[in-house]
């Protein structure tokens, strides 16, 4: 196996979608790039529901090797069983096999020129006059590699950003605990529609059913200390809302993880470093979804890294172009989603039912701000929750 070089233009830590897209764009634009992944196999372990937006928007062909289902929309299901159908262009997407998809993104990066080090761990980084010394345990051997730019894409528990003095540690109260079964013999409402369930069955979160070809991802995300996520999920499997639809369901895989739903970190750049993906809080606080957002922000980080190398300017002032780019496109959306999440977490089952009865049964998208007017008009008692949106 090829040893690591003494120096690189860019070192990306973490080969999830954000890291692979960042390294891909950095390499494609001429930067000598190293991508470091702690797992021995990229894409494992899988920790999410595996839904992604339209891949065509990223110039990626939705290959059947990793695309398991085409998604046209979803059902929002209130505690009383009332269904709201959300279906339109913005809701189109796919459910993928993350083990294959993540590896595909890494292969694509490798083909663009990135060197990839799997089963490798960054133990620390040290600031130098012109970049960072990155300490790497690579297949059991210790290396110190120099890098002009470091991109921290090392997930929700990011240490790399912390090493650089950027505050990336997440408040435990803002980490959504997730558990998921991949199951066969599940009867879906529609094989091209996702299902979302809300209420006391999943405190401060939701339960999802995502079509995945011959299987279905049945999962939950909760922010609650009374019971484990898996306990709530097991109770749901026999809940009247899904009566007769999961009776013969058989699990073929089990996944757990944590989702940062407290919004983006305050600062994602400093001299010689950028933070991206879950490490940066590039996750919707409302839905917990973040693959597409992380991919896009990864592309931005890789592009700015390559520009930085060409300009021989690795300062915070130069790299701030990355922060300006992602904030211009996503910051308002993320902060609005944080506001909506905080409102929805306070709602009782009766109030959720009242909302379901107040809004149209068919929507093209879920815009909580716009829906608030209709909700309050039909259920004035909910004004105390939604008044800041009016």
Swiss-Prot record:
Its EC number is 1.3.-.-. GO terms for molecular function: flavin adenine dinucleotide binding; geranylgeranyl reductase activity; oxidoreductase activity, acting on the CH-CH group of donors, NAD or NADP as acceptor. GO terms for biological process: glycerophospholipid biosynthetic process; membrane lipid biosynthetic process. It catalyses: a 2,3-bis-O-phytanyl-sn-glycerol 1-phospholipid + 8 A = a 2,3-bis-O-(geranylgeranyl)-sn-glycerol 1-phospholipid + 8 AH2; 2,3-bis-O-(phytanyl)-sn-glycerol 1-phosphate + 8 A = 2,3-bis-O-(geranylgeranyl)-sn-glycerol 1-phosphate + 8 AH2; CDP-2,3-bis-O-(geranylgeranyl)-sn-glycerol + 8 AH2 = CDP-2,3-bis-O-(phytanyl)-sn-glycerol + 8 A; archaetidylserine + 8 AH2 = 2,3-bis-O-phytanyl-sn-glycero-3-phospho-L-serine + 8 A. One of its GO terms (cellular component) is membrane. It holds the Pfam family FAD_oxidored. Is involved in the reduction of 2,3-digeranylgeranylglycerophospholipids (unsaturated archaeols) into 2,3-diphytanylglycerophospholipids (saturated archaeols) in the biosynthesis of archaeal membrane lipids. Catalyzes the formation of archaetidic acid (2,3-di-O-phytanyl-sn-glyceryl phosphate) from 2,3-di-O-geranylgeranylglyceryl phosphate (DGGGP) via the hydrogenation of each double bond of the isoprenoid chains. This is Digeranylgeranylglycerophospholipid reductase. It comes from Methanococcus maripaludis (strain DSM 14266 / JCM 13030 / NBRC 101832 / S2 / LL).
């Amino acid at each position: 196996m090829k040893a690591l070089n003494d120096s690189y233009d860019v070192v990306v830590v973490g080969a999830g979608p954000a890291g692979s897209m960042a390294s891909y764009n950095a390499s494609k634009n001429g930067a000598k790039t190293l991508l470091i992944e702690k797992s021995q196999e990229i894409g494992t372990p899988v920790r999410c529901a595996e839904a992604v937006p339209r891949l065509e928007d990223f110039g990626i062909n939705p290959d059947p090797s990793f695309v398991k289902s085409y998604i046209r929309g979803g059902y929002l299901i209130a505690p009383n069983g009332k269904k709201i159908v959300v279906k339109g262009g913005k809701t189109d997407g796919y459910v993928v096999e993350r083990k294959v998809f993540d590896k595909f993104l890494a292969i694509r990066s490798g083909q663009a020129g990135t060197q990839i080090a799997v089963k490798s761990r960054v133990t620390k980084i040290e600031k130098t006059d012109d970049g960072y010394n990155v300490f790497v345990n690579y297949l059991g051997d210790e290396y110190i590699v120099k890098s002009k730019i470091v991109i921290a894409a090392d997930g929700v528990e990011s240490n790399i950003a912390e090493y650089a003095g950027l505050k990336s540690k997440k408040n435990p109260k803002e980490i959504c605990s997730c558990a998921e079964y991949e199951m066969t013999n599940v009867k879906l409402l529609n094989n091209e529609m996702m299902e979302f369930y809300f209420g006391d069955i999943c405190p401060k979160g939701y339960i999802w059913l995502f079509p995945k070809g011959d299987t279905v991802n049945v999962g939950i995300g909760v922010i609650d200390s009374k019971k484990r996520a898996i306990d709530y999920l097991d109770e749901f499997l026999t809940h009247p809302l899904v009566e007769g639809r999961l009776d013969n369901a058989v699990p073929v895989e089990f996944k757990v993880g944590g989702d940062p739903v407290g919004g983006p970190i305050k600062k994602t750049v400093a001299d010689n470093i950028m933070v991206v993906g879950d490490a940066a809080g590039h996750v919707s606080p409302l839905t917990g979804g973040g693959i597409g957002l992380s991919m896009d922000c990864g592309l931005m980080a890789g592009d700015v890294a390559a520009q930085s190398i060409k300009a021989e300017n690795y300062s915070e002032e130069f790299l701030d172009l990355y922060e300006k780019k992602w904030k211009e496109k996503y910051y308002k959306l993320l902060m609005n989603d944080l506001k909506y999440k905080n409102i929805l977490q306070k709602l009782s089952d009766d109030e959720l039912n009242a909302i379901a009865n107040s809004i149209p049964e068919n929507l093209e998208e879920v815009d909580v701000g716009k829906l608030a007017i209709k909700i309050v008009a039909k259920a004035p008692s909910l004004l105390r929750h939604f008044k800041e949106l009016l």
